[in-house]
Amino acid sequence: MICNLCPRKCNAQRSESSGGGFCRMGTNPVIARVAPHFGEEPCISGANGSGTIFFSGCTLGCVYCQNYEISSLHRGREITPQELADCYKRLEEQNVHNINLVTADHFAPAVVKSFEIYKPKIPIVYNCSGYTSPKILNMLDGIVDIYLPDFKYSNNELALKYSLAPNYVETATVAIKEMLFQVGFPQFDDRQMMQKGIIVRHLILPSHTKNSMEVLDILKKNYGNQILVSLMGQYIPMGNANKYEKINRKITRREYQKVKDYYMMLGFDGFTQELDSADRKYVPEWDF
């Protein structure tokens, strides 16, 4: 196929097992881990875990990615849409609260096909970078119950420098508006597990508190309290972060508190992640 799925519109040739373009992946999904995951927000992980499938490859190129081994080095195992549907069944049998697809944009057609084969009875979570095209979101309409996008940057200069992502701000802003149109306001069951809605995540970068505060301004202006916002303090310099002096360290408590205070002042509903989460032990163990 000639691929223009993601906002990059590479016009690249992709076969089932190989591909050109930015992601350099074929059209068959490549996965690195399938298991209950307990590191998400409480309303996603709950007591039984989120049935998480980590996909290899990515449409971003974050220099600090903690999942660098799978996002950039593409380690993982190739599966078919049928095998992906079988993963949903196995996870559902483990009594997880939801099925959680992590970084699946570049495999969207295969993901849609897998849900035509088997649609779980539990909510579907789509965990993505926010750098998602309307084309992909239209494909997912009616399938996804909960969107879990990032909103990383307040300006495109930073997005290009650290994630190789042109027009990130405009793309993510439009994407989240479409997500909101599809799934609406947050809804919870009687156990306070999320059933519908959006949680927008923002990772605080060292030396960039201004970026974080401006991101929060963008979220407040565009979405108000129609979304939940998860403020993340788990940054660890991984991947190629050692080549960038300003981000080659963890965030300080002062940086974290400055952004958290601003988050609270703006009156967001959501979650704030403490600094002790910035530990390599929280990086998932891959199963190739």
Language model: regions and residue ranges:
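Auxiliary Fe-S-binding modules of radical SAM enzymes
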Residues: 1-19, 180, 184-288
